[in-house]
């Protein structure tokens, strides 16, 4: 008769637990990667569709000023497209900064000027998706903000790293300006403790 010692029994239980844990972590990783892939694909498809819709608005537009319709203020509505040619950044700008909106594009910060208005336009985006390349922006870089009304051109004045509580970064200004905001550090895992701010004046 074969006798199994208490130590052997414990060892077998430990091995079973380790195998179960390994399978659990592999499955969890696969689920997480699948979710990320689906989210990125969804965002890409939305950006393509929104870009086409914006091009159609531009084609039939021609207004001298930004038209403030009810739909322009609706969360997730397409406002325009922002481009920074030197760093190959091109992304559709949506109204608002809800979690869903920022998964699909960059968002106009409520309470700041709208495109076509005097003052400071605030735009926020995630550092690990649409605003990832902001880490490569330089002073004097050109920024284009395109809406159905036309293209507004900006030039970067300064770049600053600040606290999330610094509301002054998107404060109203007399001159027409543009402020881009994302989390910082760019490669931080989890909720980043600071904000990376790019400020530009209209040319």
Protein language model features and the residues they cover:
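N-terminal low-complexity, intrinsically disordered tails enriched in Ser/Pro/Gly
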Residues: 2-8
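Solvent-exposed, non-transmembrane regions of membrane-associated and secreted proteins
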Residues: 2, 13-203
């Amino acid at each position: 008769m074969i006798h199994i010692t208490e130590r052997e029994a414990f060892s077998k239980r430990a091995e079973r637990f380790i195998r179960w844990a390994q399978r659990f972590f592999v499955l969890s990783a696969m689920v997480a990667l699948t979710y990320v892939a689906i989210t990125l694909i969804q965002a890409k498809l939305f950006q393509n569709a929104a870009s086409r819709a914006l091009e159609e608005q531009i084609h039939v537009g021609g207004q001298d000023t930004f038209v403030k319709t009810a739909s322009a203020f609706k969360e997730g509505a397409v406002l325009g497209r922002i481009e920074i040619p030197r760093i190959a950044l091109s992304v559709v700008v949506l109204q608002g900064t809800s979690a869903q909106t920022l998964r699909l594009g960059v968002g106009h910060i409520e309470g700041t000027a709208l495109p076509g208005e005097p003052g400071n336009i605030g735009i926020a985006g995630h550092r690990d998706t649409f605003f990832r390349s902001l880490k490569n922006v330089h002073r004097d870089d050109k920024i284009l903000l395109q809406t159905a009304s036309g293209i507004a051109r900006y030039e970067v004045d300064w770049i600053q790293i600040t606290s999330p509580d610094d509301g002054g970064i998107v404060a109203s200004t007399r001159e027409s300006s543009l402020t881009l905001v994302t989390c910082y550090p760019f490669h931080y895992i989890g909720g980043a403790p600071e904000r990376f701010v790019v400020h530009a004046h209209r040319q």
